[in-house]
Amino acid sequence: MAERKAARASASYLGRHIGGPAVAWMPLTHAVIGGSLGLGVRTAFGRVLSKIAASNRRTEVRYADLPDAPTVSGSPESGVAFGDLGLQGRRFVIEASSGEQIDEVLGETGAMDAIRVYVGVESADTVEERVSLAIEELNRTGAFDRSVLIVGSPAGTGYFNYIPVEAAEYLARGDIASVAIQYGSLPSTLSVGKIPLAIEQHGALLRAINSELEQRDPADRPRVVLYGESLGAQTSQGAFVGGGTDILDELRIDRALWAGTPFAGIWRRELLAGGSGIDDTVFGTFASIDEYRNLPQEDREAIRFFFLN
């Protein structure tokens, strides 16, 4: 309404001072004013996005100090600068479970300090450099010597849910490592444009990890487990599009849990459609744990890859 009134007033002004009927000037005034309003909206929106992205560099009091444990990124021994991990990365590495914490909770002794590797989007300029940093960190911390390696694809802000990771750390008595690489600093709803980059980066990380595993004796390889939720689930699965379930074996992926995969996820739709290279006995879609428990034991034991809706 406001745009229409402004266009009419401008058309009348041009008609009076330049000549011609006002109606003849209407298409031009609509285009100019509409474009100006659109530019204003885009400018304002851009400022909002910049402010949101800037929060990635914000330092919280609780997570201001470098972690002491050499088994996490951002520590004095790490090749990844603590300040470049971003808000979510700093939270993730500092919350790593120590062997002492695990022993205290479980009432046992002998637990290890869990390994957490994280590379921020500001840690390096390119996908190749960030993946290289992650592999260097995995080797530095001894992650490939652990029994389990969790590979996560974070949400748009870089958030990698520490709760399932922490649960796994306790179950494994600390004999576990986890790794994630940030690809953006905006919420998932505003990170759709980053999906291709996130998929490329996650796929590159998985291939690099597989190359490391190839150099080790099978008995000395960690079990590789994937985890992702929401946009992280979609970008994790995006690395497998067109590869069926066979690609999981090719990359030596032992297990996976994806929570809340968006409908836009292509690979899951490919699996459900069936076809060459797809073994429908190794994956399942569930809305609750009861659905899984109600399956015959043989079916439960065959499932390695879980879609939780």
Each language-model region and where it sits:
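Flexible, membrane-associating and regulatory peripheral segments of lipid-active enzymes
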Residues: 1-148
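Surface cap/lid and interfacial helix-loop subdomains adjacent to catalytic sites
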Residues: 15, 43-56, 160, 185-221, ...
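Active-site catalytic motif of lipid deacylating hydrolases and related acyltransferases
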Residues: 105-126, 130-135, 139-221
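Structural recognition of the beta-strand scaffold that forms the well-ordered cores
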Residues: 150-152, 177-180, 225, 255-258, ...
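Catalytic metal-binding/acid-base residues of hydrolase active sites
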Residues: 156, 232, 262-263
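Gly/Ala-rich beta-loop-alpha elbow adjacent to hydrolase catalytic centers
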Residues: 226-233
